[in-house]
UniProtKB/Swiss-Prot annotation:
This is NAD kinase 1. GO terms for molecular function: ATP binding; metal ion binding; NAD binding; NAD+ kinase activity. GO terms for biological process: NAD metabolic process; NADP biosynthetic process. Its EC number is 2.7.1.23. One of its GO terms (cellular component) is cytoplasm. NAD(+) binds at residues 68-69, 73, 175-176, 186, 205, 240, 275. It comes from Streptomyces coelicolor (strain ATCC BAA-471 / A3(2) / M145).
Amino acid sequence: MTIERVGLVVHGGREGAAEAAREVREWCDENAVACTDIDVWSDTGRHSAREEVDAAGDPDLVVTLGGDGTFLRGARLAAENDALILGVDLGRVGFLTEVPAPAVRSALDAVRDGGLEPESRMLLTLRASRLLEIPAEMEALLRYGRGPLLPPPRVRTDCESGDEWGIALNVTALNDVVLEKLSRDRQISVGVYIAGRLLASYSADALLVATPTGSTAYSFAAGGPVVSPRAEALVFTAVAPHMTFDRSVVTAPDEPVGLRILERSGRAAVSIDGQLRGVLDPGDWLGVYAAPRRLRAVRLGPMDFYGRLRERMRLTDAPAAVADGTPAPLWPVSTPPPGDLAHLALPVPGAEGASGDLLREQS
């Protein structure tokens, strides 16, 4: 593909970030590609994704240097501009970043030469009963986490708004949308609707709706299922619900999840991909659903999601199982699969993938 401008998002606190950023800038100079730093960590002002993308000159490739948190901040910008995103891994327990720092030049070469197929990831978006805002008197109390508070999401001008369908917000989430309590001594009470039908009224510390990508983040920590990022689904999970039913619910991608704060509940904070975006009052509601746009992420080869799951979650074999034998490959990978298996996602004989090739080049 033709790369005309790179937007560079750097987590300066990560070891190796400065060197990796220098490599990206040098590559851009050598290839006559404009490169603009996008500071998502500064607390000197609040900018919408559109404003940040415009200031960076509408990059067609966003490169993030850091961990999953840095990738999420870059994804917010890439989704706004329909740009590709390339995550360089400088983190510790990441599922989103793809490229080890020593391979960043090779990865950029591969993107430039068009030898890679972007991976499409589901995004979430919102409708709400009103605009999301953070009350001025509560702002100081709600400044948790790293990075600046973001401005309230704007209204989407290309969508009908008002009446019983609420306001369409110009915001996307790659991981999750979370509704959480503001008071330490009181849970929030929320009516949960799936595909327009009441599932149940919950009293919980938080309620979240995750994408398959986000299933290994907060949803996983709250007891939710691990979902392949290739799947098309929404995952609803309650955090510390005060009720017998404490299971997650996995919905189809065309089944929206509605969250209405009950009239005598406390207020609730709304976080999108870990960043606080507003506070809702009793009677307010959110509708969370699959966005029409997708995130296009650079993938260097077929993703070994389950190998990464085993590695990053430090999965170990049950001692009783180990005592009973050593697992062997279920199917051989030295020959092509038979016809009835040809449509399945299975290893291809002799094709380790571009990711392995890049790693070997750096060794």
